[in-house]
């Protein structure tokens, strides 16, 4: 999903933003992203924390229950709603691959009918405020617990 940035936009005193990096090794591209909050808006801060927490919750379900990509995103949607957010399916996860990602697999993680393999898929969680005021994003590769701090 590529969108042009609006010219002249600057972070304000009470903003939420994300960094999205795509490190490359030869022709292969990874992906990682996280939201940050400037200021002290409690809703924005909770949204950013919840996006990362939901990522790890879904990743844990992937490890324990060996669910398909479809089932993982259905679970993420239920959990997001229980937390008071909407899950944005415009960012449905993707295969790690050469760029563009569709060169190896044309579908998204949310559409995958089998269990995604470790180190091959990016799980994307994008939460939105139900009133559309802000959102938060967290994404990383599906990896086991050894790759994350306890």
Describe each PLM feature range.
Residues 1-150:
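Active-site neighborhoods and metal-handling regions in enzymes and metal-associated proteins
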